[in-house]
Amino acid sequence: MSLAPSPLVGETPLHAVEVRILGCLIEKQLTTPETYPLTLNAVQLACNQKTSREPLMQLETGEVGRYLRSLEGRKLVHLVMGSRADRWEQRCDKQLELVKPQTVLLGLLMLRGPQTLNELLTRSNRMHDFDDVDEVQHQLERLIARGLAVLLPRQSGQREDRYMHLLGEPADLESLLLSRPASRGDASAPSEDRLVELEARIAALEERLARLEGAQ
């Protein structure tokens, strides 16, 4: 499948690190508003988080700072000057004219790659209260209509449709598509639900730790 980046991000698609940064800023804005906007160190920690991230990354501070400045040039993030530390906030919702449900879904797709409706519904519950999968699908269809996301054709063995963002470089998008497991049958559904629940609990603990570190 040929994947074309969204024209809404300009002539140059987003680098994989830029995609990760935006996804992290969206997530932390909604799950830990008391520590948002984020310092450079907090952005780095969020990018390198071991849960709720696909693929895992190990980014250096300088690398994160460089791509934050690149995103600032695109008006997708904004630097908030502070007396103790400078902080970063995302502006892609305003720049791309997104409502909150769309921002949440796009953020999840940036953090986790291709996902099913049920995965998105479960993983979004700490950021937005969707009524059901139909509402998730409706908002995804609006993103698709604007060229920000795509419905992927089912591969062999897959039981559910998957959706993916279109903000990244073609090679990165193809890599995301190929990196996902080819099959998740109905028999594995209970264990997948349990895994998602455990991921949410671990993420909540990590956010509590981040709040404690931010208060020091």
From Swiss-Prot:
It comes from Ectopseudomonas mendocina (strain ymp) (Pseudomonas mendocina). SUPFAM superfamilies: Winged helix' DNA-binding domain. Belongs to the UPF0502 family. Gene3D superfamilies: Winged helix-like DNA-binding domain superfamily/Winged helix DNA-binding domain. This is UPF0502 protein Pmen_2627. It comes from the Bacteria. Coiled coil: none annotated.
